[in-house]
Amino acid sequence: MRKEHDFLGELEIPDNAYYGVQTMRAMENFQITGYTADPLFIKALGMVKKAAALANMKIGLLDEKIGNAMVQACDDIISGKLNDQFPTDPIQGGAGTSFNMNTNEVICNRALEILGRPRGDYNYISPNNHANMSQSTNDVIPTSIRVCALMRAEQLIVALENLADSFDKKGEEFKDVLKIGRTHLQDAVPITLGLEF
């Protein structure tokens, strides 16, 4: 176990955890659903944080050595390798601050590890000052939700196309089966069952 502290005091963090004290507080305070974040949302968080790190390096705000390690950490998040490091309950109050801080801590601790430094060495790479540089929760969470929705939309489009194909096949299968049509809750002219699809 390693020890991390915040304004409320000190907590022990499991040695294998990339998350830190803010995530532990969220786990203590928000045990509501028993679920964790959707993997696609975690991926979107990694993408948004990677874009921020790249932009901050490009404009000279973020040291390249630290920034490149953070980008590599974001790539690990995007790939799904670190999904188990996001234990925060989806229902956690506020505007997603716990998700944002969970992500910041994972990025920092993975980047610290990449650079050969111990996890929790926030004087070197800080969740607030480095991983959250030029951002706020109100930037990160809505943007990540939109990115996640776009990725989900791709899956939805494929599913809807498959559904339309199924309807076409059923329409063809039942094109010769007659039935009574209905309109205004009354029987109407005969139609084929295939036309229902």
Can you say where each PLM-predicted feature lies in the sequence?
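Conserved, well-structured ligand/cofactor-binding cores
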Residues: M1-F197
